């Protein structure tokens, strides 16, 4: 298609050597050749040995023409290190060209932040060209400038001196200024031993700043490079002159903190040991020794403690120890405040105290322990109602007031009540483990019984005392299986608290009716008028049994 020489299109081979003598130009210095070299260096073309050889030759020529000495001890050390690093860089160029290119790219990016005339007029014999060559692998003057910039960026005088870079092997390779690596940060320099750091910090600040100015050779240096070493050196000199004082202060503070922690731990351990000793003594000895052991644990201002002869070993109390700690003082006072009780009513145990034997913090709960120890029962006790409960309550209140040391302050009374309730909780748990049989007898004219027994025979004998007061008509109807479903026997007139274990026996709409046998649950009579003394809680399964049929399991 391009056979005719008169064609208006150009021939594709017009740049041949014979046709175009302009191709004999210097390919190395032409802008197009420089652009081609730059583009090939971006891609890290490792298959181009001519480009790598040209870069190595250029770097070695710059090393030979650069002067060997300069004024200033810090400056000569920095220059010698950068020269050695550049030699290492040129040696690395032969082995790994990719790393040399990547390091040269980072060098160029840092070099862009410098002023072009800043490349040392005082420290170099020949003027450095101001042309920006970003992909030059080893430029000594730019390396020194980059090293100074690294020190200024890290805001520490340690990083601008070459002697401290020798201490760290990693910053030896990076000391040529190829990259502002994180290994040259002030934190990595401070990881050395204190003696070595103190000896290295003795370099004067003026010498360091002078060395930096000699290498840079320009007044356009950022002010942080000359002012920051002075600031940091003043701090370091203060730390250097008094390392023993700082270490002694830190050691004293640590010792004080550790001693405080040890004292707190010792106090807690002693209290726990006394608590466990009291429990063991109570479980192994009689009532007198148990009372003495409990008195050794409780201060005398807490009043006379309850007898702990019913306590078991510490294995019984260990699962509930956290609960005891949590409900020691304030929860009981909050509970009494919620119930509307005052300190006087708490100490006198007025009848408005809740009578749940599982109540967490009820003064009337350990009535069985009071009777076992020969102490009078508090007023409001369901067993003592109608049997001299008033006199017992007055004697109990007077005894508790006398046991508190005659103190009339409300704080002492509240502390005594809280201590007694805490002890009552321990006794209730121990009694629950030793006497599992509870009488849950409730009558329309009687309160909740709540007595505990160790065997089922004792409970059965106690139930006979309740049934003796029931009318004969009711007993005969019960024997015939015709007890009316709205009888108080099938009702819960006592509202137990939600946290009580007794609440598990209350009616639940999705529970199984295991409380009554089928013969005692006849069809209900909705038209039957309720008894005047009937409570507000009905037995729902006996009322709605015929409607459920076989739908309920």
UniProtKB/Swiss-Prot annotation:
Biased composition (Polar residues): 137-146, 153-173, 224-236
Keywords for this protein: Developmental protein, Metal-binding, Notch signaling pathway, Zinc, Zinc-finger
Residue ranges, annotated region (Interaction with noc): 287-553
A single Gene Ontology CC term: nuclear chromosome
Gene3D superfamilies in alphabetical order: Classic Zinc Finger
InterPro entries attached to this UniProt entry: Elbow/Noc_ZnFinger, Znf_C2H2_type
GO terms, molecular function: zinc ion binding
Record region (Self-association): 287-480
Renumbered residue ranges of the record's region Disordered: 59-243, 388-407
ZnF (C2H2-type) intervals: 437-466
Record flagged with keyword Mitochondrion: no
Gly residues: compositionally biased ranges: 388-406
Keyword Translocase: no
GO BP, sorted A to Z: compound eye photoreceptor fate commitment; eye-antennal disc development; imaginal disc-derived appendage development; negative regulation of DNA-templated transcription; negative regulation of gene expression; Notch signaling pathway; open tracheal system development; wing disc development
Low complexity biased stretches: 96-110, 121-134
PANTHER family per record: ZINC FINGER PROTEIN ELBOW, ZINC-FINGER PROTEIN NOLZ1-RELATED
Its biological purpose: May negatively regulate Notch-induced cell proliferation in the eye-head primordium. May act in leg and wing primordia to negatively regulate body-wall specifying genes and thereby promote appendage formation. Required for tracheal development.
Subunit structure: Self-associates. Interacts with gro and noc.
Family: Belongs to the Elbow/Noc family.
Name of the protein in its database record: Zinc finger protein Elbow
Gene encoding the protein: elB
């Amino acid at each position: 298609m391009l056979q005719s020489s008169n064609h208006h299109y150009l021939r594709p081979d017009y740049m041949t050597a014979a046709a175009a003598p302009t191709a004999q130009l210097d390919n190395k210095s032409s802008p197009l050749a420089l652009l081609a070299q730059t583009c090939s260096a971006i891609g890290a073309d490792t298959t181009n040995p001519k480009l790598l050889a040209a870069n190595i030759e250029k770097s070695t020529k710059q090393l030979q023409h650069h002067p060997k000495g300069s004024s200033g001890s810090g400056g000569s050390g920095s220059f010698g290190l950068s020269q050695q690093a550049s030699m290492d860089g040129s040696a690395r160029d032969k082995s790994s060209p990719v790393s040399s290119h990547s390091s040269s790219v980072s060098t160029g990016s840092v070099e862009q932040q410098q002023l072009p005339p800043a490349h040392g007029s005082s420290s170099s014999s020949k003027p450095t060209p101001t042309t920006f060559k970003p992909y030059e692998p080893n430029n000594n003057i730019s390396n020194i400038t980059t090293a100074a910039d690294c020190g200024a960026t890290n805001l520490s005088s340690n990083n601008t001196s070459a002697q401290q870079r020798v201490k760290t092997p990693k910053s030896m390779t990076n000391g040529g200024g190829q990259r502002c690596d994180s290994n040259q940060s002030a934190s990595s320099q401070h990881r050395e031993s204190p003696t070595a750091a103190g000896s290295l910090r003795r370099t004067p600040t003026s010498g360091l700043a002078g060395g930096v100015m000699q290498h840079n050779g320009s007044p356009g240096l950022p002010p942080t490079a000359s002012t920051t070493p002075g600031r940091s050196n003043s701090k370091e000199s203060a730390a250097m002159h008094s390392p023993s004082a700082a270490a002694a202060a830190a050691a004293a503070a640590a010792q004080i903190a550790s001693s405080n922690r040890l004292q707190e731990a010792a106090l807690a351990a002693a209290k726990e040991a006394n608590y466990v000793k009291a429990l063991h003594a109570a479980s192994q000895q009689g009532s007198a020794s148990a009372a003495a052991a409990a008195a050794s644990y409780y201060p005398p201002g807490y009043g006379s403690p309850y007898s702990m002869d019913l306590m078991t070993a510490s294995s019984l109390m260990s699962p509930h120890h956290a609960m005891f700690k949590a409900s020691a003082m304030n929860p009981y006072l909050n509970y009494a405040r919620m119930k509307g009780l005052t300190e006087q009513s708490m100490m006198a145990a007025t009848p408005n105290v809740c009578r749940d034997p599982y109540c967490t913090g009820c003064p009337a709960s350990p009535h069985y322990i009071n009777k076992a120890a020969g102490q009078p029962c508090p007023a409001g006790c369901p067993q003592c109602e109608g049997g001299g409960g008033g006199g017992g309550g007055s004697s109990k209140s007077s005894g508790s007031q006398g046991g508190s040391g005659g103190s009339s302050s409300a704080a002492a009374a509240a502390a005594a009540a809280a201590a007694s309730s805490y002890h009552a909780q321990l006794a209730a748990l121990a009694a629950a483990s030793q006497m599992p049989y509870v009488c849950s007898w409730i009558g329309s004219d009687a309160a909740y019984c709540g007595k505990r027994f160790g065997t089922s025979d004792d409970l059965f004998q106690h139930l006979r005392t309740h049934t003796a007061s029931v009318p004969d008509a009711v007993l005969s109807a019960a024997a015939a299986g015709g007890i009316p479903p709205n009888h108080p026997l099938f009702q819960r007139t006592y509202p137990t608290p939600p946290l009580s274990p007794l609440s598990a026996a209350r009616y639940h709409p999705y529970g199984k009716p295991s409380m009554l046998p089928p013969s005692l649950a006849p069809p209900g009579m909705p038209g039957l008028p309720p008894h005047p003394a009937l409570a507000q809680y009905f037995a729902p399964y006996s009322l709605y049994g015929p409607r459920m049929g076989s739908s309920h399991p």
